[in-house]
Amino acid sequence: MSTTDSIVSSQAKQSSWRKSDTTWTLGLFGTAIGAGVLFFPIRAGFGGLIPILLMLVLAYPIAFYCHRALARLCLSGSNPSGNITETVEEHFGKTGGVVITFLYFFAICPLLWIYGVTITNTFMTFWENQLQMPALNRGFVALFLLLLMAFVIWFGKDLMVKVMSYLVWPFIASLVLISLSLIPYWNSAVIDQVDLSNIALTGHDGILVTVWLGISIMVFSFNFSPIVSSFVVSKREEYEKEFGREFTERKCSQIISRASMLMVAVVMFFAFSCLFTLSPQNMADAKAQNIPVLSYLANHFASLSGTKSTFATVLEYGASIIALVAIFKSFFGHYLGTLEGLNGLVMKFGYKGDKTKVSMGKLNTISMIFIMGSTWVVAYANPNILDLIEAMGAPIIASLLCLLPMYAIRKAPSLAKYRGRLDNVFVTLIGLLTILNIVYKLF
């Protein structure tokens, strides 16, 4: 075979798309599609049609460029099997490892609190509106739900991991089906309210502020950062030895791009379908009630006057049940991450990494009591979920997803080739705008 034929053959082999690439594309997509998606239509539709159209333009760049930046950081380590903690320690020493451990824990723990509030509110609105039962004490409901989940976690963690993996695709399918099912109920209210002569760019309800706050919920909803490290390790072990690191980086970027396109298509279609069914005023009402959009849709169909169709009745009950299942799924997934992160912090600082000095069973019990106790306090206090996302969840995710990779690109020699690129400015800007939400919420 000639040299030219060898090159062509090699390029053809390199350009092939493997089954494992499809698996990871769907895996990244499935990781991002969780209960957080149920709040995106509320924030996106809060300001009406023009802000959500601008968010549509920003959605793919935010999802793709931010996750690609994190993947590049994970790829920069010398050990193909090294995770993100090892890579950060390689670049910045033990201090960097401590920082990444803290970031991971505090990126996940507030999400658990958010889901604690959400599942309490979702169950209570389902109990009162769909089942027509008398109102229950909030503290009791939150305690009952958390104890139920603690019981399941304690005695059936392995089973729950399997169940969660099976629930990903039915949940995504149900979102698409609900989006399609809402089409007969679409109305022109959101279009009728567009008045180009009275559009305000600035101010509390201006387009710029609405889109700015929307960026936070996009960072929160379009987030598969917890699985990026495992994804990169898998691809490096599969491709790097045979094709080199540059090809592996391109392959990772290609997979992240396809996963981002799938994610944006499903979530934005769901958001637009909800907005055309409801109205900006309804979205504001959902925010005030502190419930996910599926619960609000269920109540919306419950309040329809006259004889309801079987279709509307199915939507009323189906939306609530899907919301509950989605939140349970997300809660269990984030609980396992929070438990691992808290145990890691205790081991690192309390026992200096020596696992022989502590019983893991005892450590898991203490961590569970702290996690469930703090979640119950937050669930009972019932802070506004969107405010909690914008002030805590999204900024911490942005620190890990956007700013940490950008800092590494400036400081780490192995990432020097990525310096001076325009997409770095975009990722940095998204990270800073998300973190600045904290200042906006304070003042």
Curated annotation (Swiss-Prot):
Molecular function GO terms recorded: L-serine transmembrane transporter activity; symporter activity; threonine efflux transmembrane transporter activity
Query: What's in the keyword line of the UniProt record?
Result: Amino-acid transport, Cell inner membrane, Cell membrane, Membrane, Symport, Transmembrane, Transmembrane helix, Transport
Q: How does the protein associate with the membrane?
A: Multi-pass membrane protein
Question: Where exactly are the transmembrane stretches of this chain?
Answer: 22-42, 44-64, 97-117, 140-160, 163-183, 207-227, 259-279, 319-339, 366-386, 389-409, 423-443
InterPro entries attached here?
Answer: Amino_acid_transport_2, Hydroxy_aa_transpt, Thr/Ser_transpt_TdcC
Q: Which reaction does it catalyse?
A: L-threonine(in) + H(+)(in) = L-threonine(out) + H(+)(out); L-serine(in) + H(+)(in) = L-serine(out) + H(+)(out)
Q: Principal localization?
A: membrane
Q: Which domain of life is it from?
A: Bacteria
Q: Where in the cell is it found?
A: Cell inner membrane
Enumerate the Gene3D superfamilies for this protein: Amino acid/polyamine transporter I
Q: Which cellular components does GO assign to this protein?
A: plasma membrane
Q: What does this protein do?
A: Involved in the import of threonine and serine into the cell, with the concomitant import of a proton (symport system).
State the similarity comment: Belongs to the amino acid/polyamine transporter 2 family. SdaC/TdcC subfamily.
User: Under what name is this protein listed?
Assistant: Threonine/serine transporter TdcC
